[in-house]
């Protein structure tokens, strides 16, 4: 359970700050012209003078945007395809939840727990520090907390 005050803090303060800061960094290099996901998937392509700001704030924006997109007041089940992949990878949905919980609760300091599709097209559970995004590791996030 996450309380309403925490949700407002993350949406109205944290997420908005990430958006403002990444936009300010990108304004310094309008020639980049790529979308944020593409930039974070290839961080070496980001000009050095704004690279860390884009990684930190762009990651914060994308991480939170996915989080908001996936939020629902209703409990939902994975699609049949995702459920089959979870069973094939983790053995059961309960084992997946245990792995995801471990990724979230063992992260030292701030960060995110993720369910991702890796470069081989397989599911995995991982975590990233601070506002780092799995996109920078060549992984596609499908669930983040």
UniProtKB/Swiss-Prot annotation:
Binding site for Mn(2+): 10, 64
Pfam families to which the protein is assigned, alphabetical: Sod_Fe_C (PF02777), Sod_Fe_N (PF00081)
EC category name: oxidoreductase
Named cofactor requirement(s): Mn(2+); Fe(3+)
GO molecular function: metal ion binding; superoxide dismutase activity
Known EC number: 1.15.1.1
Cofactor: how bound: Binds 1 Mn(2+) or Fe(3+) ion per subunit.
Gene Ontology cellular component list: cytoplasm
Keyword set, alphabetical order: Iron, Manganese, Metal-binding, Oxidoreductase
Catalysed reactions, as listed in the record: 2 superoxide + 2 H(+) = H2O2 + O2
Role played: Destroys superoxide anion radicals which are normally produced within the cells and which are toxic to biological systems. Catalyzes the dismutation of superoxide anion radicals into O2 and H2O2 by successive reduction and oxidation of the transition metal ion at the active site.
Descriptive protein name: Superoxide dismutase [Mn/Fe]
Organism: Streptococcus parasanguinis
């Amino acid at each position: 359970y996450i309380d309403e005050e925490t949700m407002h803090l993350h949406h109205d303060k944290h997420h908005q700050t990430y958006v403002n800061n990444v936009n300010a960094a990108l304004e310094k290099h309008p020639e980049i012209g790529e979308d944020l996901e593409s930039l974070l998937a290839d961080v070496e392509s980001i000009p050095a003078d704004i690279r860390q700001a884009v990684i930190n704030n762009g990651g914060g924006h994308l991480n939170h945007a996915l989080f908001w997109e996936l939020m629902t007041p209703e409990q939902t089940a994975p699609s049949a395809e995702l459920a089959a992949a979870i069973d094939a990878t983790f053995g059961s949905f309960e084992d997946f939840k245990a792995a995801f919980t471990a990724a979230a609760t063992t992260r030292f300091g701030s960060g995110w727990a993720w369910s991702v599709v890796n470069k081989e097209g397989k599911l995995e559970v991982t975590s990233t520090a601070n506002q780092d995004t799995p996109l920078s590791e060549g992984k596609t996030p499908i669930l983040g907390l």
